[in-house]
C-alpha cells in the first residue's frame, strides 16, 4: 500500500529526515515512536504529500506520490495533532463544510451515519467548543470515514485522552485495519502502539532507528528499547 525509500528532508543546513525507508501492506499499521523533534510530524507531512522531500521516493497504492500527488490524495485521511475543527460550528456543520469543500456527498443521511460511527450522533447539533479532546479527535476521524480514505495518517491521536478515549481510538484503528485500511500513527504512547500496530518504528535524529514487528516486542521491552535507542539524542528542529 505504501513504500517510502530513503526519504530525506533538509531546511537550509538542517537535516530533519535522514534516509527513512519502510513499507506497509494493505491492512497494516506502523506506530512511529520518537522524542519531540525527532521528525515524526515532518515524515507524516511528507507521506501526506503536503511537503516534498529533498530526496527519496514514495509510492502509495502503486502510484509515484511525488510525481502524481493529486492521484493519491483522495486515498489519504490525515488527522493532525489538534484535529483542526471549527469551534464555533456544530459537529454536523463541521462535517458538512469539510465535505462541501472537497466536493463530496454532504447529504444529511451520510453525515449522520458518519457521526453515528464515531459515537457523536447524540451531539450533532452541539457546538464543538463544548467538546472534550477525545470528542474532537473523533470528529476528525469522521472526516476520514466520509472521505473513504484507505491510508490513515495520525499525529499523536492518544495525546490528551483518558483511558476510555485511548481505548476508543484503538478500537477505531483495529476496525479500520480490518476493513483493509492502512495506517501510520505518530505517537508517544507505548501501550497504544502495541495495541494496534503491526510494526513499531522508533525515529531519532531524523533516522528510523528501529522497524520491527510489534508481535516481537513485549510491553516491558518496548520502553527499555526506546530509552536505549533515543538516549542522548538531540531533538531535530
Where are these regions (language model features)?
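The feature captures the beta-strand-to-loop junction immediately N-terminal to the Walker
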Residues: 33-35
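Helix-to-loop junction immediately C-terminal to a conserved catalytic motif
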Residues: 48
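Conserved ABC transporter NBD signature motif
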Residues: 56-64, 72
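Conserved ABC ATPase "signature" region
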Residues: 96, 100, 106-123
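H-loop/switch region of ABC-family ATPase nucleotide-binding domains
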Residues: 187-188
Amino acid at each position: 500500500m505504501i513504500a517510502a525509500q530513503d526519504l530525506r528532508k533538509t531546511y537550509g543546513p538542517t537535516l530533519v529526515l535522514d534516509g527513512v525507508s519502510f513499507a506497509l501492506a494493505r491492512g497494516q499499521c506502523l506506530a512511529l515512536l520518537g522524542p519531540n523533534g525527532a521528525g515524526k510530524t515532518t515524515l507524516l507531512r511528507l507521506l501526506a504529500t503536503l511537503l516534498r522531500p529533498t530526496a527519496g521516493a514514495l509510492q502509495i497504492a502503486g502510484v509515484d506520490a511525488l510525481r502524481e500527488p493529486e492521484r493519491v490524495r483522495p486515498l489519504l485521511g490525515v488527522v493532525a495533532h489538534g484535529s483542526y475543527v471549527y469551534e464555533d460550528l456544530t459537529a454536523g456543520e463541521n462535517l458538512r463544510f469539510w465535505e462541501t469543500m472537497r466536493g463530496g456527498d454532504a447529504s444529511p443521511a451520510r453525515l449522520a451515519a458518519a457521526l453515528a460511527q464515531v459515537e457523536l450522533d447524540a451531539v450533532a447539533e452541539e457546538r464543538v467548543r463544548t467538546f472534550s479532546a477525545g470528542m474532537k479527535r473523533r470528529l476528525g476521524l469522521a472526516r476520514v470515514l466520509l472521505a473513504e480514505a484507505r491510508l490513515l495518517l495520525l499525529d499523536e491521536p492518544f495525546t490528551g485522552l483518558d483511558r476510555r478515549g485511548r481505548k476508543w481510538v484503538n478500537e477505531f484503528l483495529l476496525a479500520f485495519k480490518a476493513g483493509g485500511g492502512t495506517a501510520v500513527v505518530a505517537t508517544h504512547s507505548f501501550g497504544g502502539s502495541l495495541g494496534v500496530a503491526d510494526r513499531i518504528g522508533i525515529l531519532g535524529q531524523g533516522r528510523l532507528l528501529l522497524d520491527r514487528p510489534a508481535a516481537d516486542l513485549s510491553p516491558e521491552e518496548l520502553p527499555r528499547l526506546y530509552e536505549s535507542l533515543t538516549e542522548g539524542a538531540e531533538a531535530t528542529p
